[in-house]
UniProtKB/Swiss-Prot annotation:
This is Mas-related G-protein coupled receptor member G. It is found in: Cell membrane. The gene is Mrgprg. InterPro entries: GPCR_Rhodpsn, MRGPCRFAMILY, MRGPCRG. It is a multi-pass membrane protein.
């Protein structure tokens, strides 16, 4: 029995330090990404989402590093660790869902939902609304369920938690469905190839499915999973850190054309909002008609 506890303790420590290492690397990448998106690249509807998403990932990884260092120093985990880190994680999930759905609608209906068919600051205003609403959607159930303080009201907790579970389920399923649509129909059923932002949405949707959904499941079923699968939370945390840290590398790889191309050139190519043709949309190639 003692050896089982030793194995579990070693496994938990390995996941903890892996998460810390990935978070530190992701902080460096998202810092560079924020600098390029914020100061060096002209803003447009799509890269506005990515700028706010990078900010949410930066805050998530910063809190991850800060609470991890505090745990190393004090020897115990702060009670605010999970609700605070999940807050920025949820902001990123909502922003990612908005970005993927916007790319999907622009691809399906370029004449009505394209970048040139909307008010200039639509994406910016939507991002601000997402930041504000996520604060309420996470902090209210966290407070009612005793995650922020030790006071808990069972009926109020169940009511708020049920609303947050439905909200997260709708966000995750919408984002996964839209990215799957872009992946299948964009590559098989259209004569117009997907734009670079649609391709980024496809890759981001795959990352979301494998790396973000586990932490969403943990939030929804926290008491049950914590009791039955104690290793699930550190593993889900590691996957969430990988997702938040991988995006700068993903953007660089999507924008790079030459082997030793400068970072700024690759990011400008991947995230710049140059004018794109509005002749997209879903249509069968002539060879298939």
């Amino acid at each position: 029995m003692l050896s089982i506890f030793n194995i579990w303790g070693t496994f938990n420590r390995v996941l903890f330090f892996l998460s810390l290492t990935v978070s530190l690397a992701g902080l460096a990448g998202n810092t560079l990404l924020l600098w390029h998106l914020g100061l060096r690249i002209k803003k447009g509807p799509f890269n506005t989402y990515l700028l706010h998403l990078a900010a949410a990932d930066f805050l998530f990884l910063s809190c991850q590093v800060g609470f991890s260092i505090a745990k190393i120093a004090s020897g115990y985990e702060d009670t605010l660790y999970f609700p605070v880190t999940f807050l920025w994680f949820a902001v990123g999930l909502w922003l990612l869902a908005a970005f993927i759905v916007d790319c999907c609608l622009s691809y399906m209906f370029p004449s009505f939902c394209g970048p040139n068919c909307r008010p200039r600051y639509t994406s910016f205003v939507l991002c601000l609304v997402i930041w504000a609403l996520t604060m309420l959607a996470v902090l209210l159930p966290a407070n009612a369920c005793g995650l922020l303080y030790n006071r808990m009201s069972l009926l109020v907790c169940l009511k708020y938690h049920w609303v947050s579970v439905v909200w997260l389920g709708v966000l995750a399923s919408t984002a996964c469905g839209a990215s799957m649509f872009l992946l299948v129909f964009g590559n098989c059923c259209s004569s117009q190839p997907p734009s670079k932002f649609c391709k980024l949405a496809q890759c981001s949707g795959i990352l979301l499915f494998f790396c973000r959904l586990p932490l969403v499941f943990y939030w929804c079923l926290r008491p049950v999973i914590k009791f039955l699968l104690p290793f699930f939370f550190p593993l889900a945390t590691l996957l969430a850190c990988i997702d938040s840290s991988a995006k700068p590398l993903l953007y660089y790889l999507k924008g790079r054309q030459l082997r030793k191309e400068p970072l700024q050139v690759a990011l400008n190519r991947a995230l710049g909002e140059e004018s794109q043709s509005s002749s997209g949309g879903i249509s069968l190639p002539m060879s298939r008609v």
